[in-house]
Amino acid sequence: MSANELTSGDFTESGEPFKLFAEWLKEAEASEPNDPNAVALATVDEHGLPNVRMVLLKGFDDDGFVFYTNFESQKGREILGQKKAAMCFHWKSLRRQVRLRGPVEIVSDAEADAYFKTRARGSRIGAWASKQSRPLESRFALEKAVAEYTARYAIGEIPRPPHWSGFRIRPTSIEFWKDQQFRLHDRIEFRRPSPVGAWEKVRMYP
């Protein structure tokens, strides 16, 4: 099945970017071999140099797109410093892409706690043991830290580390791209002046 045979109707007619994203993600979940929620996250350091890495989208609604991380990691420090970020989803099986960018806010403690409890126990231990993005002397040092926290939290619930939580990108721009023949692709961008503004829809040259 081609990308053009998916999503009923012409996606360029949609006026609701979050609803359209939900439709595309659902189709990616049925089509992608793994991790349809994987997304490239771009941040900028204090010198204006960009960094990009893959993360997993863990939620979205009309307020924005949520992912979780160690706030002491490179991406955490850069987001806390610049308070803005960008994402790019690419679903090769569908020949589609979604780009978005905007200011970033921290999710509530209740929201972060609720998600943290859904993680595998080993992943929760790892959130304590890993000094993410810091130099690591050896693999043994990491495994030792994991063993120490495993012993510390052998009984009962594992609390969420104070340095581990979620970010929500509140997009001011969302672009939907669909592959077409001869590189005459469809590009529709939704723009708004602020995270609470009204959307303007613009068709872009490929």
UniProtKB/Swiss-Prot annotation:
Family matches, as InterPro entries: Pyridox_Oxase (IPR000659), Pyridox_Oxase_N (IPR011576), Pyridoxamine_oxidase_dimer_C (IPR019576), Split_barrel_FMN-bd (IPR012349)
Cofactor: FMN
EC number(s) given by UniProt: 1.4.3.5
Gene Ontology molecular functions: FMN binding; pyridoxamine phosphate oxidase activity
Highest taxon, organism lineage: Bacteria
Pathway: Cofactor metabolism; pyridoxal 5'-phosphate salvage; pyridoxal 5'-phosphate from pyridoxamine 5'-phosphate: step 1/1; Cofactor metabolism; pyridoxal 5'-phosphate salvage; pyridoxal 5'-phosphate from pyridoxine 5'-phosphate: step 1/1
Pfam families: PNP_phzG_C (PF10590), PNPOx_N (PF01243)
Subunit structure: Homodimer.
Family classification: Belongs to the pyridoxamine 5'-phosphate oxidase family.
NCBIfam families for this protein: pdxH (TIGR00558), PRK05679.1 (NF004231)
PANTHER family attached to this UniProt entry: PYRIDOXINE-5'-PHOSPHATE OXIDASE (PTHR10851:SF0), PYRIDOXINE-5-PHOSPHATE OXIDASE (PTHR10851)
Protein name: Pyridoxine/pyridoxamine 5'-phosphate oxidase
Organism: Rhizobium etli (strain ATCC 51251 / DSM 11541 / JCM 21823 / NBRC 15573 / CFN 42)
Taxonomic lineage from the root: Bacteria, Pseudomonadati, Pseudomonadota, Alphaproteobacteria, Hyphomicrobiales
